[in-house]
């Protein structure tokens, strides 16, 4: 908002804090009865977004966006309702990558993972580094996302399909890795509370498939390592593993979007702000605070990669380039 007001001195944006607890429910309550007090709305999850569409509280934005829709890597299509309109535009994106501990790979004489790994390649890398380094090859956190959502990366399936046969090969791969002891046991992770961050930071696991938010966690961990009496993690990132036939850079993610109140008296001004947030200027402002913009570019990637503690290798910079982002939960009236 500050960046927009700097370039639009005639506009004042006042923020309203609805709190983080049950935010989308609070937002729906605020908009009830045709309340037009709020102009621009932050959309934080798909179920809440679906509810607001059904209640008629959001202005259709299809055809009103000034940024090329293709730059959103397919996300706008996934936000499109049954009536053919999308009612929100992403400005922030968190997508998944693979983190790896360079020191573990170096000491074991294992080549680093690459930016173009099939699921079979990922499995082989997990097994190789486990055998040669004596640590877990990867840690899959206990969320469903870490295993189930490999299945949506071919662009042909979603988790609301109703038929889940397509998930079988991915579960078989991970269960085989678990049976062979090259990854932590799921049950033991649940009972012990072993967290992916701790396992990766202390060298129990050579790799970790996780969202881009973990980058800032590791940057903070390394910045405070000396004062906390721990060793920093020499980490890198590469693109997410993909099924055969899917292009490298296919990944899963979540977005935070902006919408316009259908009852706003300042729709034109609100739409201009939404368009600015989706523009290159808006994306640079998002990147400047260490957050990944929904519309990335070489310029925003350079901003992100120039932050203190970001891996300096070319592969990590290239890992920021995605070709398709599949939402962890697609738009559906069944989403919850």
Where are the regions that the model predicts?
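Extracytoplasmic/secreted envelope proteins and their assembly/folding machinery
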Residues: 1, 24, 28, 46-49, ...
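Extracytoplasmic "Venus flytrap"/periplasmic binding protein-like
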Residues: 3, 7-72, 107-109, 199, ...
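Helix-loop-helix "hinge/cap" segment bordering the ligand-binding cleft or interdomain interface
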Residues: 6-12, 16, 62, 80-145, ...
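Extracytoplasmic ligand-binding clamshell segments of periplasmic binding protein
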Residues: 21-26, 152-234, 238-243, 268
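Beta->alpha turn/N-cap motifs
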Residues: 42-47, 143, 210-218, 256
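Hinge/lid segment of periplasmic solute-binding proteins
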Residues: 44-95, 232-239, 314
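C-terminal capping/gating helix-and-loop segments adjacent to ligand/active sites or protein-protein/ligand interfaces
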Residues: 81, 298, 312-336
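Extracytoplasmic/periplasmic substrate-recognition and gating elements
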Residues: 108, 180-182, 223-292
């Amino acid at each position: 908002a500050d960046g927009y007001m700097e370039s639009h001195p005639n506009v004042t944006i006042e923020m309203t804090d609805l709190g983080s607890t049950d935010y989308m429910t609070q937002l729906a309550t605020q908009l009830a009865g045709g309340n037009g007090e709020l102009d621009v709305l932050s959309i934080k999850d798909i179920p809440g977004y679906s509810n607001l569409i059904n209640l008629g509280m959001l202005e259709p934005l299809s055809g009103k966006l000034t940024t090329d829709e293709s730059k959103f890597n397919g996300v706008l299509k996934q936000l499109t309702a049954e009536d053919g309109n999308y009612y929100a535009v992403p400005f922030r994106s968190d997508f998944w990558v693979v983190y790896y501990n360079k020191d573990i790979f170096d000491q074991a004489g294992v080549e680093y993972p690459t930016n173009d790994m099939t699921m079979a390649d990922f499995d082989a890398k997990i097994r190789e580094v486990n055998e040669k380094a004596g640590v877990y090859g990867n840690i899959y956190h206990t969320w469903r996302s870490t295993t189930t959502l490999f299945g949506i990366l071919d662009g042909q399936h979603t988790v609301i399909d109703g038929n889940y046969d397509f998930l079988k090969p991915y579960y078989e791969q991970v269960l085989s890795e678990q049976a062979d002891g090259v990854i932590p046991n799921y049950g033991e992770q649940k009972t012990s509370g072993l967290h992916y961050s701790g396992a990766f930071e202390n060298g129990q696991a050579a790799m970790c498939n996780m969202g881009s938010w973990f980058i800032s966690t590791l940057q903070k961990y390394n910045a405070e390592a000396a004062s906390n009496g721990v060793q920093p993690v020499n980490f890198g990132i590469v693109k997410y593993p993909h099924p055969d036939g899917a292009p490298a850079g296919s990944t899963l993610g979540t977005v935070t979007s902006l919408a316009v109140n259908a009852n706003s008296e300042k729709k034109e001004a609100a739409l201009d702000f939404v368009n600015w947030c989706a523009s290159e200027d808006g994306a640079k402002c998002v990147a400047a605070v260490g957050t990944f913009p929904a519309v990335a570019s070489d310029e925003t990637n350079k901003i992100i990669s120039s932050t203190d503690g970001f891996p300096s290798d070319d592969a990590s910079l290239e890992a920021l380039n995605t070709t398709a982002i599949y939402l962890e939960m697609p738009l559906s009236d069944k989403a919850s």
